[in-house]
Amino acid sequence: MSAYSPLSAQLDADTDVDVESTRTEGRRKMEWTLQHMPILQELRARFAETKPLAGETIGMAMHVEAKTANLVELLALGGAEVAITGCNPLSTHDDVSAALDSNENVTSYAKRGVDEEAYYDAIEAVVAHEPTITIDDGMDMVYAIHEDHPDLLDTIIGGAEETTTGVHRLRAMDEDDELQYPVFAVNDTPMKRLFDNVHGTGESALATIAMTTNLSYAGKNVVVAGYGYCGKGVAQKAAGQNANVIVTEVEPRRALEAHMEGYEVMPMNEAATRGDVFVTTTGNRDVITQEDFEVMSDGAILANAGHFDVEINLEELSELAIDTYEARDGVQAYELGDGRRLNVLAEGRLVNLAAPIALGHPAEVMDQSFGIQAVCVRELIENKSSYDAGVHNVPDELDREVAEIKLKAEGVDIDSLTQTQSEYLDSWSHGT
């Protein structure tokens, strides 16, 4: 077992922390969010009765906050032993992590504000539990296992990946024939991407930026880099708050989609001359670079809503700056030689989870994403022989199962196909 200590042990060693009150506060947050997560409530009842995960060890690298914690405890209730750490150095809520670590079937190593060495030490600590299932947000754990612990690959049943960036990495790994066990691309299934990516990212990113800066969007030029599902959500929600939205893209069909939906579309260097607020959502690096910083207006706000901190090139911005200082909690101002100040939120990390006041996506949205995670883990265990190594789409019946639970919880009834309609859809002989 790793020498890196679970969070409870780390807090016990800190004489300035009241561990019990910290756990109590974390538990309070978890209970509040669970009230607004009917899918997880229903799955808790099912998993508690059938114990579909009995005997399994689940290793997780996720954003450790209240909503994630409810997924963790659902998995533990289903019979699994769970070890978890963060997937971003700034997204952990220590009180929630402490509450999780007090669960006898859960070990949490997640701690906010760790340096790079401690971040990877915590991942190693989770891997030391020898997981049979992995759940990742960004693919750092899958990478660590393949790179440093190939001896574990034969005993891992499979995994699930939460986010766009992680799925991109996994598909690249799969194309190189390096991925050695099956992983569900949770990000790509409709119950995740149509809600979490669009509404979750759009609402939480903009809400966090507004609360961090105490500024309005009305009348401002908001530049959205990338028009995938996340970028589309940011653009829609910004327009709904009376911002003038400009979209930048490298993919012609997405650019055309943004244009046909009424947004201005232009290259980043042109948008940089007009933007007041910049939000990157691409999952790629060097989206905003020196040539863009050089033409931005004084006071521009720069935020990243992609997984890693590489979309805004902070090395180049630092080289341009003659001074840096904390303008507000979570806002780093870079003063340039001509007196302009460019303001970067949350160190260029995932703003809706890494900013000091960030709470992540709304509970109702994450309820759907984490419901998919839970049924994917169950599917891997119950039908492990059906999945070869590689990236797999979430089976449609699992996506529908979660949708049906949500509709029932919302009190929404829908029609069902008649036998005649089903036969018609399955037939190829009916023409004009």
Curated annotation (Swiss-Prot):
Residues 1-24 are annotated as: Disordered. It is an enzyme of class 3 (hydrolase). One of its GO terms (biological process) is one-carbon metabolic process. One of its GO terms (molecular function) is adenosylhomocysteinase activity. Binds 1 NAD(+) per subunit. The keyword NAD applies. Its EC number is 3.13.2.1. NAD(+) binds at residues 163-165, 197, 226-231, 249, 284, 305-307, 352. It catalyses: S-adenosyl-L-homocysteine + H2O = L-homocysteine + adenosine. Belongs to the adenosylhomocysteinase family. This is Adenosylhomocysteinase.
